[in-house]
Swiss-Prot record:
One of its GO terms (cellular component) is extracellular region. Has antimicrobial activity against Gram-positive bacteria and fungi. GO terms for biological process: defense response to bacterium; defense response to fungus; innate immune response; killing of cells of another organism. It comes from the Eukaryota. It is found in: Secreted. This is Megourin-3. Induction: By bacterial infection. Contains four disulfide bonds.
Length: 63
């Protein structure tokens, strides 16, 4: 028997779409986040286009 939160965590990868400051921070945080159930592992960190802010969005394989 699974509760709603457990089911949601399997269907929805929480790491997908997470935003980090800086490429290195994203790579570390995203790799960890994409190890969660439903994520399928780390795919990439995508730079969010903005000249002043160095922000990166996390993508997991099955996100």
């Amino acid at each position: 028997y699974l509760d709603v939160n457990q089911i949601a965590s399997y269907l929805l990868c929480l790491g997908e779409g997470a935003v980090f400051n800086g490429r290195k921070t994203c790579q570390i945080g995203c790799r960890a986040a994409c190890q969660q159930p439903g994520c399928g592992g780390y795919k990439e960190c995508e730079q969010i286009p903005n000249i002043r802010l160095h922000k990166y969005r996390c993508h997991c394989i099955s996100g």
